[in-house]
Amino acid sequence: DIDVTAGGVELSRLFAADNIAGFVDIPGVNPNSVLVRVSGDSMTPLVPDGAYIAIRKVELSSSIMWGHVYVVVTDDYRMVKRIRKNVDPCCVTLHSENPQYDDIDMPVADIRAIFIVETVIDCRRL
């Protein structure tokens, strides 16, 4: 398992350095997507702590769909957040679903990669 955070835990390794535990075939999930587990409650109730998300890498410069949920990778973190347009064109706003968390104004230059969240799988509800 590898985790992304919904709350701001420090990044310890990149996806490429992780070992693949296996493969799954889930109806409605793109077979090219990667499944990762979410730790933290900043995206609750949309993405609860312990849920799995199917993510697919996209290009930051051309593929942002404002208001959609992404995994944002920086040098220090990989976070699940809703990306919103910022008044400063050099930044994006990272928004949490949980109102207990403040928005983060993130310089685009600090973002190393983004992955769109395609599906949320909450195993506790299965």
Segments predicted by a language model, with ranges:
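Short peripheral tails and domain-boundary helices/loops at the edges of structured domains
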Residues: 71-92
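Conserved binding/catalytic microenvironments
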Residues: 21-22, 29, 88-90, 110
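Small-residue-enriched segments and motifs
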Residues: 36, 78-81, 115
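Short, positionally conserved secondary-structure boundary motifs
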Residues: 1-49, 59-62, 123-126
